[in-house]
Amino acid sequence: MVAAIRVPRSQRAKRELLKHAPKLVETGKKTLILHGTKTSAVLNSVLADLFHLKRDNAVKYSKKNDNIRPFESGGETSLEFFSLKTDCSLIVYGSHSKKRPNNLVLGRTYDHHIYDLVEVGVENYKSIESYVYDKKLAPKLGSKPFFAFIGEHFESVEELKHLKEVLLDLFKGEVVENLNLAGVDRVFVCTAISPTTVYMMHCALRLKRSGTSIPRIELVEVGPSMDLVVRRHRYPVESLKKEAMKTADHAKKMKNVTKDPVHGKLGKVYIPDQQIAKMSLSNDVKGLKRERREAKKNKDHSKKQKINPE
């Protein structure tokens, strides 16, 4: 499937295309959540909880897709089409079969083409609804989570290093310069149990008094939690990776230009002192023409007085 290139015919359509255009500072990545040909009740709950955690920046399709085979040649075409259609650069695809039960594929795209993929199996899953806790501790919409990766396998095993990168990209959100302490209210704890298994749990942060300026932090499980068993991987091609890692040059700072919240953009213009005495005046100046006409009129009037004396 190839989406047709459309030329905007209105200002509204033009603004929508500009939102999707490359930017010097990119906005947060959107996530596309898809169902395969067959999904289990566990997998449906996993996809629903992931959408709940990323509902401010995610698109979820509930319709089953028969022609998506992410790891087969040509099977990723539909994924790339949906990525382009929804402007999503992160993909979560769930499927269930006898060979690969409760299968979850996490993927990233570059320029709406598959960049890399990691396939995991979901085991020992506990949904958000199965946890009982004070609802005041529920993570707020738009909050940024901490990540804690426990275990040496995240540094020594290539598959887990790849999974770590994808998980960080999946929940990173928008890039910000400063963080409000009240906005950091949750943490994902990922523990490498073995070279192929990662236990992942989602916890809320409860701040308590400690007698100092730094509060004491307690972890309260709010769900979901699951074991992720690593299966297949698709690493990025080296040439594509090099292209994706390129960074744009920042625009040069304009001299003598400032921004004001009231007046907007302000600039200083330096003009040299004008030497009026040295300015050359042309003969085509309207004021001079008027003076010539008046002088000629006075001259003719004086001649008439001499010819016809009273």
Swiss-Prot record:
What GO terms describe the biological role, i.e. biological process, of this protein?
A: maturation of LSU-rRNA from tricistronic rRNA transcript (SSU-rRNA, 5.8S rRNA, LSU-rRNA); ribosomal large subunit assembly
Stored PROSITE patterns: BRIX (PS50833)
Ranges of compositional bias, category Basic residues: 295-310
The segments labelled Disordered in the record are 281-310
Positions of the Brix domain: 29-239
User: Out of the domains of life, which is the source?
Assistant: Eukaryota
- Which sequence ranges are marked TM in the entry? none
Q: What keywords tag this UniProt record?
A: Nucleus
- Output one GO MF annotation: rRNA binding
Write out the annotated subcellular location: Nucleus, Nucleolus
Its predominant location is nucleus
One GO CC annotation, please? nucleolus
Write out the coiled-coil annotation as residue ranges.
none
Family, according to the entry, reads as follows: Belongs to the RPF2 family.
Q: What is this protein called?
A: Ribosome production factor 2 homolog
Its source organism is: Oryza sativa subsp. japonica
